[in-house]
Amino acid sequence: MPNPKPLPPQSELDNIRRYNAQAIANYYRRRPWKVLWRALEVVWSFGFFLTCLLWDQWTGQVEYYKRQRAEDLRELLTKLGPTFIKVGQALSTRPDLVRRDFLEELIKLQDQLPPFDNDLAFQLMEEQLGMKVDEAYREISAHPVAAASLGQVYRAMLFSGEEVAVKVQRPNLRPRLSLDLYLMRLGAQKFGRFLPLNLGHDLTLIVDEFGIKLFEEIDYLNEGRNAEKFAENFHGDAEVKVPCIYWQYSNQKVLTLEWIQGFKLTDTDKIRAAGLDPSDIIRIGVTSGLRQLLEHGFFHADPHPGNLFATLDGRMAYIDFGMMDQLEPGTKETIASSIVQLINKDYLALTEDFIALGFLAPNTDITPIIPALENVFGSAIGQSVQDFNFKTITDDFSELMYDYPFRVPAKFALIIRSLVTQEGLALSLDPNFKIVEVAYPYVARRLLTGESPQLRRQLIDVLFKNGKFQWQRLENMLSIARSDTKFDLLPTAQLGLQFLFSEEGLYLRRQILLALTEDDRLHTDEVQRIWGLVKDDFKPQELVNVAWNAVREFSLAGVSTILPQR
C-alpha cells in the first residue's frame, strides 16, 4: 500500500486563533511571492468576467446574456475557493449592493466542494485529539458523509455506544483564508474610496468584520460553545433539538457531536412517510426562528436545508453552529415593533424604526421615503396581512435601495438571509404556507406579554398614535394573538393590570381614561367589542382573582394617580 499523504507543514498563521489583520499583513509582507501568485489568479479570473460584461454592453446583448453572466459569477466564486464562496454568500444578502439577477444566482451558491483525502482527515483527527482514530471511535465511516468548503463530516460511534458526527477541518485552511483576506484588505485600502457603494462604513472595516466572522466559523471550539449556548436558550422546549457536544473528542479543528436521526427539510416525501405533519414542522421552524431573534437575541445565521432536520419524533433539529450572531437587547424590541408597524401599515413609525435599526442615517430626510415605503410595502402586503410574503417584501425593498439612502447593517444582512431561507424551506413543505399566520400571532403575543420596559414602550407606541388610543389595533392584536394555541390570556391580563396600577403605568392610566372619553363620548362600543373577544377565556372567579392579584399591592397613595391631575 502507498504511504499516506503527509499533512501540509504547520504555518505561523495556524497559531492565530482570532482574526488579526496586522499579524496576517506582517506574515505576507515577508512572503510577497505567495501574494503575487494568488493576486494574479484572482485578477485573471475576475478580469475575464468583467471583460465579458463589457463586451455584452458594447454589443448591446446585456439582456440576452444576463442569466449566463450570473451563473458565470457563481461558478467563478466556487472555483476560487472557500473565502470567495463565503463572500458570495454574504453578498447574496445585500440587495443594496448587488443587482437582482446576480443576487438570485448567488443565493444558489452552495457551500460544497469535493471531499479532501481521507488519510489527511484521519491524520488531522489524530493530531488534534492526541490519540489514534481507532482509540477515539469504535467505528467510523470509511468516507465522509458530507463535504463543504471549510471541512467534511464522518459518521462514527463512540466506545460508550453513542452515534456521533465527526467534523474535520480542511488542511491548510487558515493560511488560505488569511491570504485571500489580506488581498481583499489591500484592495479595500487602495480602491474602496473609488467604489460607488452605500456601505455606511469604510470598506476596510467591512473586510475586517468579515474576517472576524470567518475565523470564528473555523474555530470548532467556538462552534461547540455556540451550540451549548443555543441549547441553553431552548432548554425546556420539547420541540427543538440541539446535538450534544463531546468535548473529550473535540479540538480547534475537530468537533465531535451527537448524530441527529432525521430528515432534511427538503425531503418532504420522507417526512410525510414517517407520519410527520409538515405544517407542525413549519410552525416549529418559524416560531423557533422568531424566538432566536426576539427573545434570545442569539440567532442561527445559516439555516440552509443542510443545517435543519425534522427528527423522527417531530422536533426541529439545528446543526452547524459556526455562523451565529448576537443582537443587542434594544434591537430585539425594535424588530418586533417594526413587524407590527408593517402589518398596521404605519409607514411613518416604520421609517423611524428603520432609523433606530441603522437602515437609515439619523439625519435622513424621511419625507420622500414614507410614501415610497407605502408604495412598495402596500402593494407587497396587499389588501390583507394574509398576503404577506417575506421574499416578495425583500425583492421589492431591494429595488427601493437604489433610489433612497438605505443601507443594510451587517447583522441584518444575516437576519434577512435567515428569514428568506426559512420561508423558502417552509414553502417547499407547504406551497400554501403564509409566514404571517405563524409570525404575527407570535409577535403580537410577545408585545402583549412582554415584561421588559422596552417591550412595554413598544406596545404603548403601537397602541397610541398622535396621542390617540388605537382601539382597532388592540382588537386586531388580541384577535390574532388568540389564534396562537399557546397564547394564554389570563397571565397576560394579570401582567397588564399589574403594569397599569404600577408607578410606571401612570402615563398609560391617564391615556386610557382620555381614550375612553375622547371626542366627548364614552367609547363603550369599542370596550364591548374587545370584551367579546376575550370573555370566553375568563371565568368569573378567574377574572376576580386576576384583578385582585394585580391591585393587592397597589398602595392607597397610588389611587390618586389613576385620575388625571389638574
UniProtKB/Swiss-Prot annotation:
InterPro entries: ABC1_dom, Kinase-like_dom_sf, Prot_kinase_dom, UbiB_kinase. It comes from the Bacteria. Pfam families: ABC1. GO terms for molecular function: ATP binding; protein kinase activity. Belongs to the protein kinase superfamily. ADCK protein kinase family. This is Uncharacterized protein slr1919. It comes from Synechocystis sp. (strain ATCC 27184 / PCC 6803 / Kazusa).
